[in-house]
């Protein structure tokens, strides 16, 4: 080959993953492409995998040896790379040291986050560690002014302090940071070796001056990397924007170092090579523009671009609106199954983006592809616990890996596929074993499955159930894994109003081909598409990607004719600026195209939709069309607001060469070999094995069959048919109905796990509907709601992760309506209730219940409970601290049909809530709850139609029985581990701040594996509002039991089956009909939980309350609960600044709160030292100070202000809480635990929340017992 032909001819597309680096290189001469795969880390053989891969390919093409450390770039035209370098550094916490600079009072804001805990039943709360090393608080603050009254006050008193932010909002500068102070503070940390800085000030998304000042000084000092939050993503919400700036400061220096080390191994002409990197949004950027916060999805993004541009399946031509025939591509679900997890995404002509995602405990604001991840992959571990097949979320990793890797690993999905004959060891390279020179070990996998099957069969035998073979066990885990992977697919289709069955499944990634047919069958999809390079599609997709500039600015305009010229001018200016950047890089104008977007939402809601500029420029019509499709209704009478203006400018990527393979000769195909494989419908049968490289365009293969390539194994299930497409050689699998094993009503542990996933998936999708369709901050942002499924008698079946106080007591509400209404509950009717005597908790928690009908009979119930911000009562927020009867707490409803014959009964609802201070929000949120229930009904009916009512009912009861078994085993284990007598009684006592006694007499019967919870020693009903209805006690009980069960089981009615509960009437835990109860739900419930967990020795006391703060007047009401410390336990510390036990609501972001309400949050920080000391230390509480800019009624409803949260086993007590008011004259007043006061303008409330108790004497030895 001539030297001229080689010059600038080779395009390299590289996916550097955590384990392997895949390279697809292409050039305009035979053989036109080369694929290379190598380990991402192999320091004994090379220092950088992508560069080594390039070197190897160049050697093969040029036929000569090339130096490893001075690679010749003569033949290289371009290098495109997607990398997990940033992602892995974030997951492993191996980034740069970072200094965080923020506004005074908010040093711990990013640590507290939204104050929720990730797993509601985890007593030993864990979150990933912080990524900044030190914090500087500066005397800096601005106030956003959106309230007319407050604006007029400022104009009268200090008009010169007002400025305009970039959004158009007025800003009052409260304090300008001092230049000398900034410099001295930054120097302290610079001299300690911190060279990367992240800056986030409150409201800097619209007012940039103070961040720019800090950035300027940091640059003067010599900081090497400076991340200013407003320059990265100027969107409202201080926490995610601040975390984004920290992520950028943490990762960008690492990425820059990686790029430097990568390029230094080439010759001096590397600067002439076009090098670009894949960003999280699916667009490429030049190497010098690649930033840490845009790198998180750099790896998987290439695969999404790859399938979006190569999946060529179409539906039949049809008539469009103009009466013409058109061919339309089917929407596609991307299915990328790897070793530890599976990523799913959706494509329907455009890439779907989201602008706020969470990874490794950090919320990141940036345009990212809407990729949903589930912890199920080839390396997911297999467990059998309490009669349940469980897959993951733990992974065996690459080392030691599955059992078959011969490194003393554990059973994983890969082992199951190997045992079933779906993976063939002879087609894997010999890279396993301790010396990485052995093949996959089938015999080791067989032995491990034999041991697991023996364990499972012991359970089967004990429960008079049929014994299982190793094949059945292995396939059972495959089926459970498939169901787990279906859940996120349902969430991105059905939960958003799309029909799953109308999509094509595009499968890629190393493990996906073994599961794709089953996944498609489960979801009713007609086809699977597998690209010829599916195993390296993330690399291949890089060659199809565009260079992209994506930029946006915040906005606060109403979408109307008056503002049209303003936002269109801003949009056009953004387009021109971005376009000019690409022109400056040498792209011709004809290759550049621009997209404009408005981020729109209804006034008073948080659900914004990014609307691409329609052809007719009618953004409003497009927004409403999308909104109605996704949510099923429109909100009338509300302004449309513009939150952000965005542009996305592309420079079209050069297309890769079209792949071509030979056409089929039409002769019968001869398999490479025959392998015994197991399939559910036919058992273990002879299965033909084909090599993809031997197949031609037009070949067809009937299942069962296996197709093998260098990078993937594809299982074609029975009744499916694989077609090799012309001329590309891509694979299309037509999915047949298949013959699944008939599911009977008899307990099958495999189907038990499958139904557990299905029931929980339905509840999850109900929750997604309620988030998207609700109006109020309480429900939409703080997530103070729950959704669940119930049996025909009202027993809890399954719920989505939610608020424990709701879920445990909702079944009492459903049961009450079942008993009260009976046959008077008709189809098309929806019932509302909130009364504590009807299974309610406290009155603001409104429960909406709907029956699921099948052939004219009620067969299930679905219900949703949401906390409404105001329903009347004597104080705004309907949480009066001093209520003496329920009539003072708001509208009390035993049973009200709010939907009859399918029609919302608005007049009746308005009359019921006539004293609400925000009736429109009540109505909107009730409609959201109705919509969530409707979704639940649809999905339940689909499940019944698929399996039959008898089977679905049977597994409903099996799942409840499974939970019962898990609790019984837990009671038995605790009896043994705590050295109790076979029948033994424990007593746990605590007191409310008013002295009311809460006493549990706990009797555990080891032989029966049961317990009696006797509350007879508790105090009498109080003349106040800390009375707790019986549903609250049952809720605290079911939560505590579930929290002490170590395995993953669904929370349901079965948890209470082993428990006899004794609650005498007339007590604080079983009050009279008219007693006040608002505090019982939010305060006494926490004390009940502390008493139960103390009796079991599970952990010390948490902060013991929810710190309920409300404020408002006759025009508005606001409510929040505030985090504190959790109790330590055996071998774990308590957690700081988090919600505990019976609640898990989020806190409203400070910028959202201040924009909507006339307040200033002065401080939100950790209350250091408030946790109890001990062998294991209790978590610390928080300090929260809010200044009011109008006269308001402010109410606090709290506990643990008199009595400290207790330590356990010699651990010390935590600090009690404190509520203060700071008057305008500078005087502080202690307002006690429960009070309602009229606060004057500019006065503040300061809340110090309690910590959690310590566990064990400080110098003692604590064992697991």
From Swiss-Prot:
Pfam family, one: Hydantoinase_A
Domain of life of the organism encoding this protein: Eukaryota
Keyword DNA-binding: no
Keyword Hydrolase applies: yes
Entry GO MF terms: 5-oxoprolinase (ATP-hydrolyzing) activity; ATP binding
GO biological process terms on file: glutathione metabolic process
Catalyses which reaction(s): 5-oxo-L-proline + ATP + 2 H2O = L-glutamate + ADP + phosphate + H(+)
GO cellular component, one term: cytosol
Keyword set, alphabetical order: ATP-binding, Cytoplasm, Hydrolase, Nucleotide-binding
Coiled coil: none
Localization, UniProt: Cytoplasm, Cytosol
Top-rank EC class of the record's enzyme: hydrolase
EC number(s) per entry: 3.5.2.9
Family: Belongs to the oxoprolinase family.
Quaternary assembly: Homodimer.
PANTHER family for the chain: 5-OXOPROLINASE (PTHR11365:SF2), 5-OXOPROLINASE RELATED (PTHR11365)
Function: Catalyzes the cleavage of 5-oxo-L-proline to form L-glutamate coupled to the hydrolysis of ATP to ADP and inorganic phosphate.
UniProt name for this protein: 5-oxoprolinase
Gene: oplah
């Amino acid at each position: 080959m001539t030297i001229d032909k080689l010059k600038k001819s080779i395009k390299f597309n590289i996916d550097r993953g955590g384990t392997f680096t895949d390279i697809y290189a292409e050039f305009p001469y035979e053989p036109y492409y080369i694929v290379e795969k190598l380990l991402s880390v192999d320091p004994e053989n090379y220092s950088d995998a992508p560069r080594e891969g390039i070197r190897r390919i160049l050697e093969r093409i040029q036929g000569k040896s090339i130096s490893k450390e001075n690679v010749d770039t003569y033949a290289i035209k371009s290098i495109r790379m997607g990398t997990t370098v940033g992602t892995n550094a974030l997951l492993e916490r191996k980034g740069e040291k970072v200094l965080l600079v923020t506004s005074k009072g908010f040093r711990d804001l990013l640590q507290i986050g939204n104050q929720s805990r990730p797993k509601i039943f985890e007593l030993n709360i864990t979150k990933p560690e912080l990524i900044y090393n030190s914090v500087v608080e500066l005397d800096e603050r601005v106030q956003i002014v959106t309230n007319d009254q407050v604006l007029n006050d400022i104009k009268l008193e200090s008009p010169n302090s007002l400025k305009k932010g970039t959004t158009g909002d007025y800003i009052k500068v409260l304090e300008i940071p001092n230049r000398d102070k900034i410099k001295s503070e930054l120097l302290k940390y610079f001299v300690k070796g911190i060279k990367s800085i992240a800056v986030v000030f409150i409201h800097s998304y619209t007012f940039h001056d103070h961040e720019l000042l800090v950035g300027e000084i940091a640059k003067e000092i010599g900081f090497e990397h400076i991340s200013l939050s407003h320059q990265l993503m100027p969107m409202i919400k201080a926490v995610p924007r601040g975390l984004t700036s920290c992520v950028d400061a943490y990762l960008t220096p690492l990425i820059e170092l990686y790029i430097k080390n990568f390029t230094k191994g080439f010759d001096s002409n590397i600067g002439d090579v076009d090098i670009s990197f894949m960003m999280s949004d699916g667009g490429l950027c030049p190497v010098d523009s690649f930033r840490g916060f845009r790198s998180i999805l750099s790896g998987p993004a290439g695969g999404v671009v790859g399938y979006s541009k190569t999946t060529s399946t179409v539906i039949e031509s049809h008539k469009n609106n103009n009466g013409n025939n058109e061919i339309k591509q089917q929407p596609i679900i991307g299915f990328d199954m790897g070793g530890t997890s599976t990523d799913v995404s959706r494509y329907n002509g455009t890439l779907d983006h989201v602008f706020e995602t969470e990874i490794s405990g950090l919320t990141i604001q940036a345009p990212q592809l809407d990729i949903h991840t589930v912890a199920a992959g080839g390396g997911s571990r297999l467990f059998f616990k309490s009669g349940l097949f469980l897959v993951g979320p733990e992974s065996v990793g690459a080392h030691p890996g599955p059992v078959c890797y011969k490194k003393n690993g554990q059973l994983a999905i890969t082992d199951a596929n190997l045992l079933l004959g779906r993976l063939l060891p002879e087609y894997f390279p010999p890279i396993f074993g301790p010396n990485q020179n052995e093949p996959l070990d089938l015999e080791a996998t067989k032995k491990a499955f034999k041991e697991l099957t023996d364990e499972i069969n012991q359970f089967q035998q004990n429960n008079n159930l049929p014994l299982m073979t190793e094949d059945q066990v292995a396939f059972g885990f495959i089926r459970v894994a498939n169901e787990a992977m279906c859940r996120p697919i349902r969430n991105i289709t059905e939960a958003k109003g799309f029909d799953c069955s109308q999509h094509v499944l595009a499968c890629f990634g190393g493990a996906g081909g073994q599961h794709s047919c089953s996944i498609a069958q489960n979801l009713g999809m007609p086809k699977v598409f597998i690209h010829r390079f599916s195993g390296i599609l993330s690399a291949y997709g890089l060659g199809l990607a565009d260079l992209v500039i994506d930029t946006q600015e915040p906005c606060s305009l109403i979408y109307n004719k008056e503002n049209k010229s303003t936002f269109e001018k801003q949009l056009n200016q953004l387009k021109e600026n971005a376009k000019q950047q690409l022109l400056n890089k040498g792209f011709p104008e004809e290759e550049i195209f621009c997209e404009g977007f408005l981020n729109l939402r209804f006034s008073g809601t948080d659900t914004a939709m990014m609307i691409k500029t329609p052809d007719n420029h009618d953004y409003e019509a497009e927004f409403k069309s999308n909104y109605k499709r996704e949510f099923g209704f429109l909100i009338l009478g509300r302004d449309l607001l513009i939150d952000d203006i965005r542009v996305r400018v592309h420079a079209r990527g050069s297309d890769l060469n079209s792949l071509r393979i030979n056409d089929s000769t039409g002769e019968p195909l001869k398999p490479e070999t025959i392998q015994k494989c197991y399939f559910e419908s036919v058992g273990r049968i002879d299965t033909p094995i084909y090599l993809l490289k031997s197949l031609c365009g037009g070949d067809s293969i009937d299942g069962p069959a296996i197709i093998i390539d260098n990078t993937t194994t594809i299982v074609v299930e029975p009744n499916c048919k694989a077609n090799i497409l012309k001329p590309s050689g891509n694979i299309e699998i037509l999915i047949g109905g298949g013959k699944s094993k008939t599911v009977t009503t008899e307990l099958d542990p495999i189907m038990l796990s499958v139904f557990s996933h299905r029931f929980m998936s339905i509840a999850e999708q109900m929750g997604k509907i309620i988030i998207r369709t609700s109006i109020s901050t309480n429900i939409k942002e703080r997530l103070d709601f729950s959704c669940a499924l119930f049996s025909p008698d009202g027993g809890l079946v399954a719920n989505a992760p939610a608020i424990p106080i709701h879920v445990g007591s909702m079944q009492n509400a459903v049961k009450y309506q079942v008993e009260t209404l009976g046959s008077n509950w008709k189809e098309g009717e929806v019932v509302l209730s909130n009364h504590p005597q009807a299974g309610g908790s406290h009155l603001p928690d409104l429960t909406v219940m709907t029956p699921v009908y099948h052939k004219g009979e009620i067969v299930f119930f679905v219900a949703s409970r949401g906390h409404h911000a105001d329903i009347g009562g004597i104080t705004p927020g309907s949480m009066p601290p001093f209520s003496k009867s329920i009539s003072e707490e708001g509208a009390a409803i035993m049973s009200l049909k709010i939907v009859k014959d399918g029609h919302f009964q608005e007049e009746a609802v308005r009359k019921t809530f006539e004293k609400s201070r925000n009736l429109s929000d009540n109505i909107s949120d009730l409609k959201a709850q109705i919509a969530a229930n409707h979704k639940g009904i649809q999905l339940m009916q689909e499940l019944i139609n698929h399996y039959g009512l008898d089977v679905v009912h049977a597994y409903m009861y099996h799942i409840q029985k499974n939970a019962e078994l898990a609790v019984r085993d837990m009671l038995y284990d605790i009896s043994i581990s705590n050295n109790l007598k076979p029948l033994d009684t424990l007593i746990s006592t605590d007191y409310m701040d008013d002295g009311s006694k809460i006493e549990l007499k706990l009797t555990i019967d080891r032989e029966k594996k049961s317990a009696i919870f006797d509350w007879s020693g508790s105090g009498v009903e109080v003349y106040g509002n800390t009375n707790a209805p019986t549903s609250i006690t049952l809720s605290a009980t079911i939560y505590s039991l579930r929290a002490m069960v170590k395995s993953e089981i669904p929370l349901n009615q079965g948890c209470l089956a082993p428990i006899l509960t004794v609650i005498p009437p007339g007590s604080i835990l079983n009050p009279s009909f008219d007693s006040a109860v608002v505090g019982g739900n939010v305060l006494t419930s926490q004390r009940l939980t502390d008493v139960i967990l103390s009796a079991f020795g599970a952990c010390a006391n948490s902060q013991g309350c929810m710190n309920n703060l409300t404020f408002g007047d006759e025009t508005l009401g606001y409510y929040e609960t505030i985090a504190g410390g959790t109790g330590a336990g055996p071998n774990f510390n308590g957690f700081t600044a988090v919600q505990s036990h019976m609640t898990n609501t989020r806190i409203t972001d400070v910028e959202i709160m201040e924009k909507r309400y006339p307040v200033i949050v002065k401080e939100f920080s950790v209350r250091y030292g408030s946790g109890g000391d001990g062998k294991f230390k209790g978590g610390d509480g928080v300090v929260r100070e809010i200044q009011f800019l109008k006269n308001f009624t402010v109410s606090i409803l709290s506990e643990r202000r008199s009595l400290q949260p207790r330590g356990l086993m010699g651990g010390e007590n935590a600090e009690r809480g404190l509520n203060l008011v700071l008057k305008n004259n500078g005087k502080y007043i202690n307002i006690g635990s429960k009070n309602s006061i009229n606060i004057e303008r500019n006065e503040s409330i300061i809340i110090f929340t309690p910590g959690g108790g310590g566990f064990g004497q400080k110098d003692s030895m604590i064992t697991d017992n």
